[in-house]
Structure formats: C-alpha cells, structure tokens
C-alpha cells in the first residue's frame, strides 16, 4: 500500500481584477459616478523663480522662502494688470534688484521733487554684474506716477516725510552750504536752536501715522539730523539730497532689513546705545537681500557704522564689508559713489575719538578713487584721514606732510576769517587726524565763539573734542579750555536732540 496519495493540482489565479473591499457587506452601486479629483490650477502670483521651477511658491514678500532655503536668487513677483494700468506709460525708477521689489514713489514726493527743476538720479538696477546704476531718470517724469497699493505688507505713511524740495530749502537756509550755482561754502544767518522745532517742520504733525512696528521718533530724527549731517559734506548736491531724503526711505519702506539697520544707525547718531543694539539685532534677523545687490551694500554699511560706534563690535564683519565696498567702486554709479563717500566719512568719525582701532583695515576704501566734482575738499580730506587712521604705527611726521600737501592743494588755511564754519571744522578734522592738538583746540575755540548751530558742525566739533581726551595735563589751561569746549558743543547737541523729539519736550 502506497502511503503517498496524489491529489489533483489546482491552479489559482494570483492577480485579481476586481477591487478588494475590507467590508464584505459593501456592494458598489454602478449607477453612482465616482467623484472627480480636483484639478490643480497654476497660480500666477508666485515668484518668477518658483514659476520657472514649476513648484509651489509660498509667496512670502519680499523674498520667497523656497528660494531662501535653497540659496537661490528670488526674482520677485510680477506686477498685476491693475498695477500696470495704474503705472501708465511712465514707470518709476527700478531701485531694487532680483530679490527686492520696486520701491514706490508717492505722488506728493514726486511732484515736490519736480518743482526744483533739477534732474535727480535713480538706479536702474542694483546688480553690479549685469546692470548699471547710472541710468538716471528725470524727476519731471516721476510726477505722473501714482502710488501702487501692495497687499503683502502695510507700507509706511510717507506723508510725514519732507519732500526733496523741503530738504533742499532747509539745507540752504540752515546749514551754511552752497547751492549748485556756488562753488564754495558761504555763511548765512542761522536761526537759534530753540526756533528749530515743530514750527519749522510742519510735517512732524503726521508722525503719529507711522506704523507701530517703526520707531516714531527715529525717522523724524533721521530727516532732521542724519540727512543734514550727511548732505552738509556733500555741499548740497541735488543727487545726494534726493538719495538720502527720498530714495533711502523708500528702500526702508519696502525692506525691513534696511529699515531696522537705518534705525540702528540713527540711534547711534542719537547716542542711544540701547536702541542701537535693539535695532541691530532686529536687522540681523530679517531676510537679507542678494549679496550682489546695492541693497545689501546699504544694509551692510549701516550695520558696520553702527557696530564701530558700539563698545563691542565685530571687526571681521567691518573689514570684510570695507573690502567688498571697495570692489564695488568699479561700478560707475552715482549711488555707489555716494555710499562710499558717506562710509569713508563715518568711519573717520567713528575712529577719531578712539585714536585708533588695532586690526581695523580701511586702506581698501582709502585707495579707491571716487571723482566727485561737487565735494573734492571733503572727499580728499576724509580719504587721507581714513588712510592715516588705518596705519597708526607710521610716523606722525609723514601724516602731517600729507595733510600739509592737502591744504596747499585746496588752499585751506585754519585762521582765515572768511571761511565758513563747515570748512573750518573740516580743517579741524585734518588736525585731529594728524594729532596737531593745539591747532585743533584753536580751531574749535573759533567755532565756539561763532555760536554755530549747524548739526554737521556741532557733531564734528564734538568728535574732535573727544579726540583730545587724556592729551593735556589736568592742571594746564589747555585742559580747562578743552573742558569748556566739550561742554559747549555737548549742550548744543543736547538741545538739538530735544528739538528733534516730536513728543512733549521738557524745558532745559
């Protein structure tokens, strides 16, 4: 008997054609049509980079987070048809590049700028590799531009900002600087510090309309203090006036990193160290523009100048920015030249009270040749001063020889009674850089007797006084005179700060 029994083979089909339902009681209804899947529609509001890559854009303004995370260059967002109709046939100057959107020019500012009859400069694009910032637009064309409403963020109210024409008239009347028709600084009758208040600045009444995320005190201070201080050494050049009073606020309106870095720079100008630290931290947390953009240079300039005036600073960051800004000088642009000239001056002002900063290297900027016909005296002096402060180990006699050659070239003489306070204080800077302490003291004594209220002269004189600390013996008459001069200019600066304050100001 065979113990093995053979069974017939059964072939099983392993592939089932029907659907398997875990519920045995489920019976499909053939009369019910399946629900169609929702079709995905492509949106036209994403950034150009994500649309080209065919991925979903999170539409974060001004930079897409997808591009930021992948270290790609965000090309911005296209304008809608309604915006293009509102713009008309004339478009505003393109002040931003790739990652930044175009800043808006309000009608009030544009129309007031057109009243001057001068041609202001605007940058076409800020990418140094492909575009040139020298493409200027006439201010008469800007008068037809209407402001564009942006949905991604609430823009700042620029109604409280002074127009370029108001700043132009203010600098002519109060800051002892010539117009374009004059080649040298001329003296003028200046109002007292107490008269420079809300009566002289009617636009301060609308400061309360600023958004809550912006400091309502610093932006008026920027226009009343920082802009006049910068434009005084530009000798009232229209391009510089328009850039610092109109273009830079538009950058700050559209980009939070520029706004916070600008407020940090204004805080340090106001001697507010805590506010400078606060805004500096906020600026570093904001998304930064592309590294090859003009906006990046502007933010880095404000951050560098703020850091050098603080007790703790990152010297590597400052030196790296100086090198990059010197490389950008090859771009033939009025805006880049303005930024380089301002940075050179502010670097000298930051180092002058300290005597020197070991490890600081400003030679790359001092070797840059920026030819500007409207301010050759100040540009040449501060360039030489930056080079001297970057080489503290060299002999003082070599530095003095360079400064003497500068005075002979531009016919600058300290004891000339016909000179304006601005040119006198420029010469005091030259003596302070070369450590001619007695000449600095004599020049500041002359300025103290003139009772000048120009904020550029006051601030520069105060910094020159600080450079004389621990120089004279405590029982000498020079020491007492230095203390009197420091007290005089310090009091005038405090009164100026109080006049720039839009809140209830206490009476001193």
Curated annotation (Swiss-Prot):
> Can you say where in the cell this protein is located?
Nucleus
Annotated coiled-coil segments of the chain: none
Query: Looking at the record, which segments are called Disordered?
Result: 15-43, 110-146, 174-193
Q: Which PROSITE patterns match?
A: ZN2_CY6_FUNGAL_1, ZN2_CY6_FUNGAL_2
Q: From start to end residue, where is composition biased (Low complexity)?
A: 176-193
Q: Which residues bind DNA?
A: 46-76
The intrachain disulfides are none
Classify the main location.
nucleus
Q: Which UniProt keywords apply?
A: DNA-binding, Metal-binding, Nucleus, Transcription, Transcription regulation, Zinc
Give a single Pfam family match.
Zn_clus
Q: Does the keyword DNA-binding apply?
A: yes
Q: Which InterPro entries match?
A: Transcr_Regulatory_Proteins (IPR052360), Zn2-C6_fun-type_DNA-bd_sf (IPR036864), Zn2Cys6_DnaBD (IPR001138)
Protein's GO biological process? positive regulation of conjugation with cellular fusion; regulation of transcription by RNA polymerase II
Q: Which GO terms describe its cellular component?
A: nucleus
What superkingdom heads the lineage? Eukaryota
Q: Which PANTHER family match?
A: ASPERCRYPTIN BIOSYNTHESIS CLUSTER-SPECIFIC TRANSCRIPTION REGULATOR ATNN-RELATED, TRANSCRIPTIONAL REGULATORY PROTEIN MOC3
What's the subunit arrangement here? Interacts with zfs1.
Q: What the protein does?
A: Induces sexual development and ascus formation. Also involved in calcium homeostasis.
Name it. Answer: Transcriptional regulatory protein moc3
């Amino acid at each position: 008997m065979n113990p093995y029994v053979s069974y017939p083979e059964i072939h099983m089909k392993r592939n089932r054609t029907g659907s398997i339902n875990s519920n045995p009681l489920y019976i499909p209804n053939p009369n019910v049509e399946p629900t169609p899947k929702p079709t995905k529609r492509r949106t036209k509001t994403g950034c150009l980079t994500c649309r080209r890559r065919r991925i979903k854009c999170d539409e974060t303004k001004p930079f897409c987070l997808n591009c930021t995370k992948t270290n790609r260059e965000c090309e911005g967002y296209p304008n809608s048809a309604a915006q293009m109709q509102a713009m008309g046939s004339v478009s505003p100057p393109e002040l931003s590049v790739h990652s930044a959107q175009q800043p808006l020019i309000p009608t009030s500012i544009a129309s007031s700028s057109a009243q001057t009859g001068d041609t202001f400069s605007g940058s076409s694009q800020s990418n140094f590799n492909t575009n040139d910032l020298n493409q200027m637009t006439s201010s008469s064309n800007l008068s037809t531009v209407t402001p564009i409403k942006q949905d991604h963020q609430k823009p700042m109210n620029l109604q409280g900002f002074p127009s370029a024409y108001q700043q132009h008239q203010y600098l002519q009347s109060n800051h002892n600087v010539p117009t374009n028709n004059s080649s040298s600084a001329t003296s003028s009758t200046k109002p007292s510090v107490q008269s420079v208040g809300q009566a002289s600045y009617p636009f301060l009444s609308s400061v309360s309309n600023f958004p809550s995320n912006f400091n309502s005190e610093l932006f008026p201070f920027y226009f009343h203090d920082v802009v006049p201080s910068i434009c005084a050494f530009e000798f009232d050049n229209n391009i510089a006036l328009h850039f610092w009073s109109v273009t830079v606020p538009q950058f700050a309106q559209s980009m939070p990193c520029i706004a916070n870095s600008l407020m940090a720079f204004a805080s340090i100008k106001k001697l507010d160290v805590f506010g400078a630290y606060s805004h500096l931290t906020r600026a570093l947390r904001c998304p930064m523009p592309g590294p090859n953009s003009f906006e990046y240079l502007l933010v880095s300039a404000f951050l560098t100048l703020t850091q050098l005036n603080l007790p703790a600073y990152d010297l590597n960051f400052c030196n790296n920015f100086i090198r990059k800004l010197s490389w950008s000088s090859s771009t033939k642009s009025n805006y880049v030249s303005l930024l380089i000239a301002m940075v050179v001056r502010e670097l000298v002002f930051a180092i002058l009270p300290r005597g020197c900063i070991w490890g600081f290297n400003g030679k790359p900027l001092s070797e840059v040749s920026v030819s500007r016909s409207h301010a050759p005296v100040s540009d040449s002096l501060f360039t030489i001063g930056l080079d001297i402060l970057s080489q503290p180990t060299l002999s003082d006699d070599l530095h003095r020889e360079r400064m003497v050659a500068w005075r002979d070239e531009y016919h600058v003489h300290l004891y000339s009674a016909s000179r304006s306070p601005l040119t006198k204080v420029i010469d005091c800077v030259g003596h302070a850089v070369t450590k001619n302490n007695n000449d600095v003291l004599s020049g500041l004594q002359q300025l103290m007797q003139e009772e000048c209220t120009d904020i550029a002269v006051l601030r520069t004189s105060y910094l020159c006084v600080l450079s004389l600390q621990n120089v004279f013996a405590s029982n000498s008459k020079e020491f007492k005179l230095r203390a009197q001069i420091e007290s005089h200019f310090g009091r005038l600066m405090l009164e100026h700060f109080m006049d720039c304050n839009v809140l209830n100001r206490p009476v001193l």
